[in-house]
Amino acid sequence: MSNMEHDRWSRVKGRLRSSVGEDVYSSWFARMDLEAVQPESVHLSVPTRFLKSWIQTHYSDKVLTCWQAELPEVCRIDLTVRSPMRAAVAKEAAAPVEHRRAEHRPATETRSHATVPASSNHDALGGSPLDPRLTFASFVVGRSNTLAHAAAKQVAEGRRGDPVMFNPLYIHSGVGLGKTHLLQAVTWAGNTGIERKVLYLTAEKFMYGFVAALKTQTSLAFKEALRGIDVLVIDDLQFLQGKTTQAEFCHTLNALIDAGRQVVVAADRPPSDLESLDERVRSRLAGGLVVEMAPLGEDLRLGILKSRVVAARAHHASFDVPAPVLEYLARAITHNGRDLEGAINRLLAHSKLNAQPVTLEMAEHEVRDLIRPQEPKRIKIEDIQRIVARQYNVSRSDLLSSRRTANVVRPRQVAMYLAKTLTLRSLPEIGRRFGGRDHTTVLHAVRKIEGLVSKDTTLSDEVDSLKRQLQE
């Protein structure tokens, strides 16, 4: 991808993010790649058929509109499902980074790996494919993921009949920070013997399995099979759609937890932010251990880079990346683990195809499009409510209540104003998060505070202080 194409694609993604909101963008578009731009069409790709179908059904017009703002002559968007594994050395050195599902995968081979079942149990129960490289041994531990790693290890090392310490275990983070790696590691480790049945499913696989069971009138067998699992591992829960499917997931979740079976779940946001999920599901998920995997620190990024180089040497013994180059990459590439792996893949490809050693100059040229500006902190409505409540000495439940006393109304209006100005939530969404209020109530609050801060210096200082606290 040339610099011009990269810049154009970045602008289109920015328009799309502004159009649909941050949460929708993260759920449905974060893994969409630009493949090619033709005179009248644009070729995009996504990793799964489910994503392709959902985007085509619900967002095709928005995607086309965003592209037409950049290239008016574009009249068609071609969306395809890309191969889950792209061989690095089969492409030119400047090819874009792989966007594979599994986080922190080592760049061990330049050919595709066949996915294999963890055990006959996992295979017979129709589990989602597992990558044999995603184990605890290949997971790089750092400050941002220590708790998630420790909790996952404890789950994996448990035995049938042991008391369950935290249930469910809910891991959330942004894209490419290691959630899938940990979940598949739990599955691999748990299925090393025959004592326990550990099943890994993506939310997409769960949906398709349940819908297929309904169509073939085998839903009872589907339910019984799931409820006989010792450890159920569900990935990408944010994609779970449909009231009937969500109800069945809730019943399965309750049945397993009540029976003392372990449930492990991963998603791209905390349970409270999964607005498309039924409140009962969110409540049950929040009742377990909720662990956030924070963005990768520089030391952890360096550790991941080193591990990928070691893995690559297993098949390319002469491949080497000097320490100054690794340190440069760790400082410059800050977004996620996939970009780090993509950088090593590019250096490996360039070095092998051109028979040249890796240098700092080569690295600066090859990864320039992976160096992104630092993203601002993502502020959540729950954070706004918590900090505003603390500032004005009221409770969060007061902000959500119908109370109309002066000591509650003003903080509530300030919180709504901050939610509108510091997040990408729509007015109706903000209203729902403030006790189910109408969007006109939110609009009134926003306009009220906008008018007051220009005249009331005390209120203006309070709002500025709240913004600083939220952005720290």
From Swiss-Prot:
Annotated region (Domain II) at: 73-128
Name the principal localization, coarsely classed.
cytoplasm
The biological process GO terms on file are: DNA replication initiation; regulation of DNA replication
- Gene Ontology cellular-component annotations: cytoplasm; plasma membrane
Basic and acidic residues compositional bias, start-end: 97-112
Recorded hits in InterPro entries, A to Z, give: AAA+_ATPase, Chromosome_initiator_DnaA, Chromosome_initiator_DnaA-like, Chromosome_initiator_DnaA_CS, DnaA_C, DnaA_dom, DnaA_N_dom, DnaA_N_sf
Question: Region annotation Disordered: residue ranges?
Answer: 92-127
The record's subcellular location field reads: Cytoplasm
Sorted UniProt keywords = ATP-binding, Cytoplasm, DNA replication, DNA-binding, Lipid-binding, Nucleotide-binding
Where is region (Domain III, AAA+ region) located? 129-351
Q: Which cysteines are disulphide-bonded?
A: none
Give the comment on domains: Domain I is involved in oligomerization and binding regulators, domain II is flexibile and of varying length in different bacteria, domain III forms the AAA+ region, while domain IV binds dsDNA.
The record, for HAMAP family, names: DnaA_bact (MF_00377)
What is known about its subunit structure?
Answer: Oligomerizes as a right-handed, spiral filament on DNA at oriC.
Question: What is this protein for, i.e. what is its function?
Answer: Plays an essential role in the initiation and regulation of chromosomal replication. ATP-DnaA binds to the origin of replication (oriC) to initiate formation of the DNA replication initiation complex once per cell cycle. Binds the DnaA box (a 9 base pair repeat at the origin) and separates the double-stranded (ds)DNA. Forms a right-handed helical filament on oriC DNA; dsDNA binds to the exterior of the filament while single-stranded (ss)DNA is stabiized in the filament's interior.
Specify the protein name. Chromosomal replication initiator protein DnaA
What lineage is this protein's organism placed in? Bacteria, Pseudomonadati, Pseudomonadota, Alphaproteobacteria, Hyphomicrobiales
